[in-house]
Regions:
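Outer-membrane beta-barrel translocator/pore domains, especially the C-terminal barrels
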Residues: 1-171
Length: 172
C-alpha cells in the first residue's frame, strides 16, 4: 500500500541582536540570520505484507521517499529543495540517501548515499558523501553484533579531494 503524508511547517527567526559580522566565527551557529520560511514535506511510504516464519502476516516498509522544499516568505522565492529516501527492497538490503539542491544556483549542494547489507549479526555498509566544491568522500563500515549488548564496529571515511583518511574508528 501507499501512504501519502504531506506536512507544512513554519520557521520564523527574527534579526539577531548582534550582527554576525561582529562575531568571531566559531561554528555554523554564528552564521544564523533572519529567517521567515515555510517548509513543505511530501512523505511517501510504500509497504508490503510478508509472511513471517510462524505463518502470520506482518507489514514491512519497503520504501520511504520524502521530497521537500522551502519557500522564503521575505523574498517569495524557493530557497531549498531536496529529497530523503530509505529503500528496503529486501529485509537484508537497504539503501538510504538524501540530496539538497540550491534553488537559486540550481546546483546540487550535498548528496549522501549509503548501501548496506545485514545478515544475522553482521552489517556491511558502503557510502558516498558529496559537498559541491568542497568534498567527495567514501565511507565503509563493518559491524558485528557479538551479544545483545556488545558490538564491534570498524568505520573508515576517505576523502578523494586530498587522497587521505578523514576518519577511522574502531568501536567495541
Amino acid at each position: 500500500r501507499h501512504i501519502f503524508e504531506p506536512t507544512v511547517s513554519y520557521n520564523y527567526r527574527p534579526n539577531p541582536t548582534v550582527l554576525r559580522t561582529k562575531l568571531q566565527p566559531f561554528d555554523a551557529i554564528d552564521a544564523i540570520d533572519k529567517q521567515n520560511v515555510i517548509h513543505y514535506n511530501f512523505e511517501n511510504k510504500f509497504q508490503t505484507k510478508e509472511r513471517a516464519a510462524d505463518g502470520s502476516l506482518s507489514t514491512r516498509e519497503i520504501a520511504r521517499i520524502i521530497p521537500f522544499f522551502d519557500t522564503d516568505l521575505h523574498t517569495g522565492r524557493l530557497r531549498n529543495a531536496g529529497m530523503r529516501m530509505e529503500l528496503r527492497p529486501y529485509g537484508w538490503l537497504g539503501i538510504e540517501g538524501d540530496s539538497m539542491l540550491d534553488a537559486e544556483s540550481r546546483h546540487v549542494d550535498t548528496t549522501n548515499l549509503d548501501f548496506y547489507l545485514e545478515k544475522g549479526p553482521v552489517r556491511l555498509a558502503i557510502g558516498q558523501r558529496y559537498v559541491r566544491d568542497e568534498s567527495s568522500q567514501l565511507t565503509a563500515e563493518i559491524r558485528w553484533k557479538l551479544t545483545q549488548d556488545l558490538d564491534v564496529k570498524f568505520y573508515e571515511r576517505y576523502e578523494f579531494e586530498t587522497n587521505d583518511s578523514k576518519e577511522f574508528e574502531v568501536m567495541l
